[in-house]
């Protein structure tokens, strides 16, 4: 089953230049114009591992910083080409001090700090107080920064996450709306529209090293959120960007034969077109360089580039990482994200197709409405045909082995969240979730404890919200409320004890924040704040009055 994703000649040529430069004692030529990601004006955004590859590798290999993300977020104080040339020359001198060189040439970035709650502040009040601390505005950024400018203010998650993230932001925006911060919701939506217009897609985050991938496509849901305030005018305004995002996810579909894949698109044996996660690069992630190299080294039977691509695709999924993507369910080196057709991604793309059809209808574009409506129906049927497990739940699909994955996970509820599930299958999925994923602190992510952060025992705010909304949409209000109240109690317990909200929670009954993964637990925290406010509206003190 071929995976038709050969690198273009320009990229191969760029890699040759990089290898030649790495072997030289002097500065290499400036990377060609084809290298890096061009924006709409033709300017390039070049990631740190491309701008000064030898220095980048030396810093990461020598672990100058405990977090590999730290250096790629640092600001070069001079032209990268000059820094690179000086490094290649100076590193040959006796007594060369790498740390001192970095200190002279880069300004380090700090973490996003949030203040403890004021005495007596309840959970909702504290979250409202956090929004200003998490808000950033970089309409212009210093030259050569890895940060990508955005025209309007935005809210970051917090901690080591100093930039805006795509799918995080939808759940953050839910909280902003609940706090009455409607202008900030519009600002963030406009920023994402700007990213689509500038780069052709919404990157993982607004960093140059994130441009080679996206994240779960929630832009249409952001437009829905804005439409609650201004009606169909929002759909008409953002129709061009909705269509551009759709084109990004469907690029490569033309000419595919059955059982082939290209970029994000997979054509199944029956001719159905579905999607997978993907990344345009097959190198270690810059922000997790050593970790990715170590992972690839544990799979000597696989080409390293294949492992790197699957790690990057796992990062695009937002579930980085999870037994969901692992062939053996335990070892990260067995990751095969690009071989899997994920149920959540395809449910979200179904919603995107439906929203484009709605926007076209509002714009009196009949052919457009009918075309996207037909695409949505074809996708819905393909999901029902292939992404359903006979045990009674929606499941991911292994397109290479032509069978559904034998593991339920929280993504099984996305077809309910997006409204594509039949009533009968929604009910069976709800029963399976109640039997297998319900924990003392809310909804489990998976049923496996692999040591990865998107596995047992962690519960994540966005997945709680998807579950609650999906179950409510199909009349399973009691189960939705049970999940929502359990998670709220978990958040409240951590807040009462530690005075903060965190990225993820241990929902096994330990009443603490979550663990696992590649970095320490982060607090702030954008999507936990947003979902908590929405759950308080539904199930908190005084809800429904």
UniProtKB/Swiss-Prot annotation:
Subcellular location: Periplasm
Record: residues binding substrate: 160, 167-168, 204, 213-215, 285-287, 318, 518
Top EC group: hydrolase
Transmembrane feature ranges: none
Catalytic residues (UniProt): 320 (proton donor/acceptor), 503 (proton donor/acceptor)
Annotated Gene Ontology cellular component terms: periplasmic space
Record keywords, A-Z: Glycosidase, Hydrolase, Periplasm, Signal
Pfam families per the UniProt record, alphabetical: Trehalase
Source organism superkingdom: Bacteria
Chief location: periplasm
Signal peptide extent: 1-30
EC number: 3.2.1.28
Alphabetized GO MF terms: alpha,alpha-trehalase activity; trehalase activity
Biological process annotations from GO: cellular catabolic process; cellular hyperosmotic response; trehalose catabolic process
Catalyzed reactions: alpha,alpha-trehalose + H2O = alpha-D-glucose + beta-D-glucose
Described purpose of this protein according to its UniProt entry: Provides the cells with the ability to utilize trehalose at high osmolarity by splitting it into glucose molecules that can subsequently be taken up by the phosphotransferase-mediated uptake system.
Protein name from the UniProt record: Periplasmic trehalase
Protein source organism: Pseudomonas aeruginosa (strain ATCC 15692 / DSM 22644 / CIP 104116 / JCM 14847 / LMG 12228 / 1C / PRS 101 / PAO1)
